[in-house]
Amino acid sequence: MPKVRTKDLIEQFHLELISGEEGIHRPIDTSDLSRPGIEMAGFFTYYPADRVQLLGKTELTFFDTLTSDQKQERMKALCTEETPCIIVTRNQDVPDELLQASRESGMPLLRSSQTTTRLSSRLTNYLEGKLAPTTAVHGVLVDIYGVGVLITGQSGVGKSETALELVKRGHRLVADDSVEIRQEDEDMLVGSSPDLIEHLLEIRGLGIINVMTLFGAGAVRNYKRITLVINLEIWDQKKNYDRLGLDEEKMKIIDTELTKITLPVRPGRNLAVIIEVAAMNFRLKRMGVNAAQQFSERLMSAIELGNQE
């Protein structure tokens, strides 16, 4: 099922429907837009018919210089069965040839009061957000000191309980149990909650609680960029865990690699505090302050100094 149809653009941007009402359910499969200037001159070899077409002042001014036969020919070529719609910007008058071609092909012809550049920018942002690659991950997403932390781990390891403690400490819940993730840009993953379980948290033995009702609107947010993954696992005596923080694990989601920290879970460990510190330490590293690296350098300097003596 298509994520975006022409009718969605009409509703989102309050576009005026001039003709082609029967085609408003046409799918839009790309966030790329087209301003068919070269096509107005008659070159249709590489015409991207599957894109939303924008006709601005430049295109229509040139169109006025064409002969009557050329106008009809160009507009018929523009209005294909594949084209989602044509949008005339700046509330300009719609040429009769375009109106006729739209009616014959059933292609939606729309009009906007916005400038071409402004509308193009808004359309691109909207379509990129809607058409971005998506996936779902089992875990909890929390905003901790401005860092989007995705907490993962096996079922029953304590993800939701840890998230509840983090919310009590003033941080904000984004999603629990199922995190919908979309890649809005290169190296940019944004997580949100499915509508059905938005603002809800499931605690074993307690049931489902509404975080916004209990803790207020400041305890939740609708979406957050994910920059850090913390994986909780039951403590394994045979496994060697990182004690210095020099080695950095990575986890790939869609086409983006994220920093991953594995935290062993055992009785007596305050996971909420550890995750808080992990988020703060992650921010420090991004600012160029790496405590583990500094310790390693001091240690090497001390060893070299000892060898010289």
UniProtKB/Swiss-Prot annotation:
Residues 201-210 are annotated as: Important for the catalytic mechanism of both phosphorylation and dephosphorylation. The keyword Nucleotide-binding applies. Its cofactor is Mg(2+). InterPro entries: HPr(Ser)_kin/Pase, Hpr_kin/Pase_C, Hpr_kin/Pase_Hpr_N, P-loop_NTPase, Ser_kin/Pase_Hpr-like_N_sf. ATP binds at G153, Q154, S155, G156, V157, G158, K159, S160. Mg(2+) binds at S160, E202. The active site is at H138, K159, D177, R243. Keywords: ATP-binding, Carbohydrate metabolism, Kinase, Magnesium, Metal-binding, Multifunctional enzyme, Nucleotide-binding, Serine/threonine-protein kinase, Transferase. It holds the Pfam family Hpr_kinase_N. Residues 264-269 are annotated as: Important for the catalytic mechanism of dephosphorylation. The keyword Zinc-finger does not apply. GO terms for molecular function: ATP binding; magnesium ion binding; phosphorelay sensor kinase activity; protein serine/threonine kinase activity; protein serine/threonine/tyrosine kinase activity. GO terms for biological process: regulation of carbohydrate metabolic process. Its EC number is 2.7.11.-, 2.7.4.-. CDD domains: HprK_C (cd01918). It catalyses: [HPr protein]-L-serine + ATP = [HPr protein]-O-phospho-L-serine + ADP + H(+); [HPr protein]-O-phospho-L-serine + phosphate + H(+) = [HPr protein]-L-serine + diphosphate. Both phosphorylation and phosphorolysis are carried out by the same active site and suggest a common mechanism for both reactions. PANTHER family: HPR KINASE_PHOSPHORYLASE, PROTEIN YJDM-RELATED. Homohexamer. Belongs to the HPrK/P family. Catalyzes the ATP- as well as the pyrophosphate-dependent phosphorylation of a specific serine residue in HPr, a phosphocarrier protein of the phosphoenolpyruvate-dependent sugar phosphotransferase system (PTS). HprK/P also catalyzes the pyrophosphate-producing, inorganic phosphate-dependent dephosphorylation (phosphorolysis) of seryl-phosphorylated HPr (P-Ser-HPr). The Walker A ATP-binding motif also binds Pi and PPi. This is HPr kinase/phosphorylase.
